Amino acid sequence: MLNKTKLILFYSTVFYTFIFGNPSEGVWKQFLYTDGISSNYIFDVYKDKKDRVWIGTQNGITLLDGNNTRKYGASHGLPSADIIKVTDIDGRVFVATSGQGVYVLKNDTFEKVKFVKGSNVNTMENIGDQIFISTNLEN
């Protein structure tokens, strides 16, 4: 469990650095649960082409859109599972969960992607105009 926590902290730091830039330039802002983030346990941070920031957490997704913060959780169709990866293709947002498969955002609700075999997603990457998903197949 300690190694998982260290890994989560490492990736969170790397992604924050990537998105928010050089520490010697500009203004840094730390977002916490008290600021409206779904959870302080962050698994993924993704910036889309509209400059919105999607944060995959232990308790759903938080969308940072300018000055607005929006949370997506069970009431939006997401399972109660860790959101480990967020990506998009042509404006369609996909999320990978730990143990509950992959979901796509349609009309402000997440729907499960049924063609993905295996619910335990290891990673998901957007390469060109395709999404590649690594899962553990189940019998």
Language-model region placement:
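Carboxylate-rich, polar loop motifs that coordinate divalent cations or form catalytic acidic clusters
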Residues: M1-N139
